[in-house]
Each structure stands twice: as structure tokens, then as C-alpha cells.
């Protein structure tokens, strides 16, 4: 209509008789409704200049630690707050969480924390954030239940405000209006978020797939996603985990058929199944099959016991009366009458399955009468840990089904065709692939470009990026503080690169400690030096090496006396360098050397 109005004056000027011949058109052109819309168009232009800032604090270039902050008109909201498990180089580290410096600096602006679903890579860091400051948590019923369980361990559940949300129920948070949208995933009650702001609407999918035959909760809400696409979506932030996989993700129904076949194969054996404790759908399938097969069910692993109890309480899991037994009761039934559902599908060192493989589980002893199913694929980086457990179980005589041997696992993430459907339905102006390593983000970006989204409108951001969006442009602003904070026991952030380097050094070459007593005035050795070795060599089999090392230390201390070196740090440095050089010449190894000089 606007184009018609712009063209009419020129047409009238070229044809003076036009007005008399088309008076109706002239009256239509000057109708008040047209001009009444002009202020609204001007207002829309003003709104279009309002930017929204997106700050990814985790989840880009990595799988895990998902956390994103949105800012518009001075208001902020956070979506997800997850953790990532440490890699093999992070010696002694329990988990890695995002750096909260940026959100703590802006805590007065933050209106709430929105959670897409209850997996650890999306909720695992919440207790550590709430130790910094309080803020309300918005999540679906199951998600809030899982978070509440986690916060109880930290003594934070009682003072945290939970707001239970449901799909299509809009939430007003400052200048943001957020609508949860139901999506399929490997855990119930998963949602995407449509985040409406003065700058426009952004859709963040969370973890999703499109399962046309789901076990429960219905298909991903494609209708609502399409409606937002028709209204206009400023940007889409979409799950990239399976961006390299063509086709569609298999339905969860496929797992039921595969596990049913394995139940038949293990007719006369005890069945042990390891899966994610949060995969409520999978656990329910196993329970249903156990009931069909006339077997009792037991749970092992703290998270498995806690999650299933909570899921039953909230009505997400149904276990027929008389089916559930405790793990202590397993031996009271014949092997062919029980199923044990356990944690440890990712090879976690302290998990129930890991303890079974190392014969350290107090209630369960694995042997030739066991049929073990690992119903999960290893997360990248966990392959060695899983293989170690599989080998341990096989050595004990058990039959083990793992990885792709049978259809015992399907992904909870969208493959390429589902990602294309999400892009097609939402029709975003800008696209930001999220939730994946760089190669996955890159592949997802190429998929979006193949559907016609201009490459100038596609941005592969990094953790700490300041992505500024408006209806007119997408650009990067000044980055914000970001990083990986390591949690080791009760210590949060007190393990840095220097500590990790020392731990790595100790793990590779061991430690040599030098103890000597010296005169504080003259520097002469009064006792020692004595050498203590840990993780370096077995002293009794290397006496000549240790005797030579002792002589090197004595000579270094004597030279310090002769040269009147009295600064104890300098003395320690000389001793360390002399001994390090000697040990490397003899062994080609470089243990950590720790001189301890006691002054008398």
C-alpha cells in the first residue's frame, strides 16, 4: 500500500486529467486510515534503532557450559547456566563453569534466569551463580524439580524463588516478553524461548530435535514456531550439536525396539543398563520392558536414585507397585528376574558402573551371568573412559553391549534436515549457530546459507562476544569478560593454569624433595641433605642415582657458602638447577624439585 501512495502523485502530475478520471482513487489515497498509520511507521523506525545485545558466556566452540545473556533498554535476562566436565588435561578438576564476572557486575539489571531444560550442561552451574547473588529461576515443572534437588545439596533451595512456566505462557521480564515453546529432546519438559523485545524477536531453540512419534509430550510445536516466522524473527540461535549429520535424528521409539530384542537375548541373565540419570524417557522405557519381562527393577547411582524419585513424585515416571526394589535386594532374586538401571554411561570414575567394573561396588558383583547394556554414546572426550569400563566388565566375564552394536541409543539433538526445518519455519533475518564446537557451528552456518540466508547475516560468535542486533544491522561490540572457572572439591576458581601445569608436571615425572638444615649465619650444612622421591623412581632400585643426587646438592650448597650467597631464594634456585641438570643427564626426565632449607 505504501508503494501505491508514493507512485500516485507522479502519475497525477503526468496526466492532468487523471484526478477527474479517477476521483475514487484520489479519495482512497487521502483516506484517514492511511495517514493514521504514518505515526506508527515512524514509531516502528524508532524501535528498529533500539539494539539488543547478546552475550554468550559459554556453549560456543564447546559442548557444554551453556549460558547466554540478553540486554535491551537496560534490562537483562539470562538463558541457561550449565557446566562442562573437565578434559583429561585438567588433573583433579571436578567440573568447569562459566566466569560470572560480567553478570555479577550487572546483577542489578538482571530480571531472571530462564532454563530451557534440566541437563547438567544447562543447569549445572546454577548453585555457583546463586552463591554470588539471588535471582528468580524460570523453568518447566521437571526442570525446576531437578534444579531444586541440586540446590538442596548447597543449602540454597529454601531461599531461591522458582517460577514454574508452561509452553505458550508468556512471561514479562522488564522490556522482554518471553514465550516458552515446547520442543522434543531426550528429557521431558524441554522448551525453546521466543524472546520479544523493542529490538525484535529472537528465538533460542535450546537443545531440540523433531520427533514425529515421541514417547510423550507431543511433537515439537512447529505451529508456534511458524507463527513467529510469519510475524518476523530478528534472529535465531539454534542447536548445532548434530550439524554434521545428514538426515533426521531417529525417534526414541527405535530404542524401545532395540532394547526389547536385547531383553529377549538376555533371557536367563541379569540385565544391567547404564544410561543418563536425566533421560527420564529412556528409564521409563526400560521399566516398561522389565515389567513386560516379569523382572524387578533397581536403581544404582545417587543421581539416578534422586532423579527417578523426583520424576515419580511429579508424575513424569510411572513404576507399577511391587516392581521397584532396592539395590540391596538384588541378590534375593534369581538373575533372570531383575534389571539394574545405573549411572556411568560416560565412564565417570566414581559412577556406579565404574565401581562395578573395578569390583569396588559394595552391593553389585559383576560376573559371567550379567548382560550389560550401555544405552548412550560417549560424549566427545569420554571415549577412553568408556572403553576402560567396557574392558573391565568384559574381563569379569560379562557380556557388554555398547555404542553402535545395537539400537540402544538415539540422539536428543536435531540433524541437518531438522535444522533446515527450524530455519525454514522461523525465517530469521539473522542467524547465530550455538551449542557446539567450531566445526559444528561452521557446518550449521553453511546449512543456513544454503537456504538463502545472506552470509552477511550469519555470525559465528565466540564466548565473550558482544553481538549487537537491530533491524538494520548485526555487528560486534566490545567483548566482555569470559572464561572457564574450574571447580575442585569445595574450591571454586582457585585452580588456575599454574596449578594445572604443576599437576601435569607431577603426573608425568614425579617429585623430588630436598631437606637440609643450615646455619643461618654461615650457611653451612648442619644436617642432611636428605632426598625424598615420590612418583619419580623407586629409591631402592636406584640407589646410585640418589647417592649421586645427594652429592650434587651438597656441592651446590658448599659453593653457595664459598661465594657468600645468603639469600635463601637464590640458594634454593641454585640447588634446584644443579639437581635438575644432573637428573636430566642421567634419566632424560624432569621431576618437580622442591628444596626445603631449615635455618638454625
Can you annotate each of these PLM segments?
Residues 136, 432, 594:
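Short glycine-rich phosphate-binding loop at a beta-alpha junction
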Residues 564-600:
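C-terminal tails and terminal domains of large nucleic-acid-associated
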Residues 32-114, 119-333, 351-365, 384-388:
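His/Asp/Glu-rich metal-coordinating catalytic cores
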Residues 60, 84-98, 109-110, 402-405, ...:
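A glycine- and charged-residue-rich anion-binding loop/surface
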Residues 1-48:
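Intrinsically disordered, low-complexity RNA-associated tracts
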Residues 166, 462, 589-593:
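Short Gly/Ser/Thr- and Asp/Glu-enriched loop/turn motifs at secondary-structure junctions
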Residues 245-375, 379-428, 432-548, 552-564, ...:
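Hard-cation-handling environments
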Residues 151, 448, 583:
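Conserved hydrophobic residues forming the short capping helix/wall of the S-adenosyl-L-methionine
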Amino acid at each position: 500500500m505504501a508503494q501505491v501512495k508514493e507512485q500516485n502523485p507522479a502519475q497525477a502530475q503526468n496526466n492532468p486529467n487523471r484526478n477527474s478520471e479517477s476521483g475514487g482513487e484520489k479519495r482512497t489515497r487521502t483516506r484517514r486510515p492511511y495517514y493514521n498509520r504514518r505515526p506508527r511507521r515512524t514509531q516502528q523506525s524508532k524501535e528498529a534503532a533500539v539494539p539488543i545485545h547478546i552475550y554468550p558466556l559459554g556453549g560456543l566452540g564447546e559442548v557444554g557450559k551453556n549460558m547466554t545473556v540478553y540486554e535491551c533498554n537496560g534490562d537483562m535476562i539470562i538463558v541457561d547456566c550449565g557446566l562442562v566436565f573437565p578434559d583429561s588435561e585438567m588433573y583433579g578438576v571436578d567440573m568447569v563453569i562459566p566466569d560470572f564476572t560480567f553478570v555479577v557486575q550487572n546483577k542489578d539489571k538482571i530480571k531472571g534466569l530462564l532454563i530451557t531444560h534440566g541437563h547438567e550442561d544447562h543447569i549445572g552451574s546454577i548453585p555457583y551463580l546463586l552463591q554470588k547473588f539471588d535471582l528468580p529461576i524460570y523453568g518447566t515443572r521437571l526442570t525446576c524439580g531437578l534444579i531444586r534437588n541440586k540446590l538442596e545439596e548447597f543449602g540454597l533451595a529454601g531461599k531461591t524463588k522458582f517460577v514454574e512456566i508452561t509452553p505458550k505462557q508468556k512471561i514479562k521480564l522488564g522490556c522482554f516478553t518471553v514465550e516458552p515453546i515446547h520442543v522434543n529432546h531426550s528429557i521431558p519438559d524441554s522448551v525453546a524461548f521466543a524472546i520479544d523485545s523493542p529490538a525484535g524477536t529472537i528465538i533460542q531453540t535450546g537443545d531440540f530435535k523433531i520427533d514425529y512419534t515421541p514417547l510423550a509430550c507431543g511433537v515439537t510445536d512447529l505451529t508456534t514456531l511458524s507463527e513467529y516466522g510469519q510475524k518476523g524473527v530478528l534472529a535465531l540461535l539454534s542447536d548445532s550439536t548434530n550439524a554434521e549429520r545428514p538426515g533426521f535424528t531417529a525417534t526414541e521409539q527405535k530404542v524401545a525396539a532395540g532394547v526389547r530384542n536385547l531383553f529377549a537375548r538376555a533371557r536367563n541373565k541379569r540385565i544391567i543398563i547404564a544410561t543418563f540419570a536425566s533421560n527420564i524417557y529412556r528409564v521409563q522405557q526400560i521399566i516398561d520392558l522389565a515389567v513386560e519381562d516379569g523382572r524387578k527393577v533397581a536403581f544404582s547411582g545417587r543421581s539416578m536414585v534422586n532423579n527417578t524419585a523426583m520424576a515419580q513424585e511429579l508424575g513424569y515416571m510411572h513404576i507399577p507397585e511391587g516392581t521397584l526394589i532396592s539395590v540391596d535386594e538384588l541378590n534375593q532374586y534369581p538373575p533372570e528376574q531383575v534389571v539394574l538401571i545405573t549411572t556411568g554411561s560416560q565412564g565417570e570414575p566414581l559412577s556406579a558402573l565404574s565401581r562395578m567394573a573395578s569390583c569396588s561396588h559394595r552391593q553389585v558383583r559383576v560376573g559371567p551371568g550379567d548382560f550389560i547394556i550401555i544405552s548412550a554414546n560417549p560424549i566427545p572426550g569420554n571415549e577412553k573412559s568408556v572403553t576402560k569400563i567396557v574392558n573391565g566388565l568384559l574381563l569379569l566375564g560379562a557380556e557388554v553391549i555398547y555404542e553402535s552394536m545395537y539400537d540402544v541409543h538415539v540422539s536428543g539433538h536435531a540433524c541437518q534436515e531438522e535444522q533446515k526445518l527450524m530455519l525454514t519455519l522461523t525465517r530469521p533475518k539473522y542467524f547465530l549457530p550455538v551449542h557446539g564446537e567450531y566445526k559444528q557451528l561452521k557446518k550449521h552456518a553453511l546449512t543456513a546459507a544454503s537456504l538463502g540466508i545472506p552470509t552477511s547475516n550469519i555470525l559465528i560468535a565466540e564466548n565473550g562476544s558482544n553481538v549487537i542486533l537491530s533491524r538494520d544491522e548485526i555487528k560486534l561490540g566490545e567483548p566482555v569478560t569470559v572464561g572457564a572457572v574450574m571447580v575442585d572439591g569445595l574450591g571454586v576458581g582457585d585452580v588456575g593454569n599454574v596449578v594445572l601445569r604443576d599437576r601435569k608436571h607431577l603426573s608425568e615425572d614425579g617429585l623430588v624433595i630436598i631437606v637440609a638444615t643450615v646455619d643461618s649465619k654461615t650457611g653451612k650444612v648442619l644436617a642432611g641433605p636428605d632426598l625424598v622421591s615420590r612418583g619419580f623412581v623407586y629409591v631402592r632400585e636406584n640407589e646410585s642415582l640418589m647417592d649421586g643426587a645427594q652429592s650434587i646438592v651438597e656441592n651446590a650448597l658448599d659453593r653457595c657458602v664459598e661465594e657468600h650467597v645468603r639469600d635463601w631464594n637464590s640458594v634454593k634456585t641454585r640447588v634446584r638447577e644443579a639437581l635438575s641438570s644432573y637428573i636430566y643427564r642421567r634419566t632424560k626426565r624432569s621431576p618437580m624439585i622442591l628444596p626445603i632449607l631449615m635455618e638454625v
